[in-house]
């Protein structure tokens, strides 16, 4: 009976890890791009940034509690998960993008969800010229089904950010908004 709380904790950790990792990751092999499991609870994560404007889309980003402990100037720890929702921008009857009173694009329907997850050694399977530390990328349809994308394009876009930004776009903006910038 004394070990019941410990047993419960071990079981809870096993269940939580199985939700995030793919079967290949659970069996000890390193996951590859496109093999992450859709994190169904990501809306409960702290907001990384919201309302990020693109020419024809609006993005909302979430960072799991492990990653949210990171301080400015640090790399995100193993176990970090960054989720990006990409929304279509709303159009009027004439096909023009609608803007709110603030002059920003208005969100329409959710188009897709991209996930970056980091863990020890996970970047080993990435091509040498496209290594983004130990981040792995996956893309999903709004319903959580896998979306086939060119992950080399994801890696190429994040590569110029380098180790200083841990290959994460808007790294400095996040910490400035969070109030932890130096």
Name each region found by the language model.
Residues 28-50, 54-55, 73, 77-182:
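Sequence context surrounding c-type heme c attachment/ligation sites in exported
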Residues 8-18:
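Bacterial N-terminal signal peptides
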Residues 19-20, 157:
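General secretory precursor processing signal
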Residues 1-9:
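Bacterial N-terminal signal peptides that target proteins for export
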Residues 55-67:
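Short, structured beta-strand/loop micro-motifs enriched in basic residues and often containing a Trp
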Residues 20-26:
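Sec/Tat signal peptide C-region and signal peptidase I cleavage site
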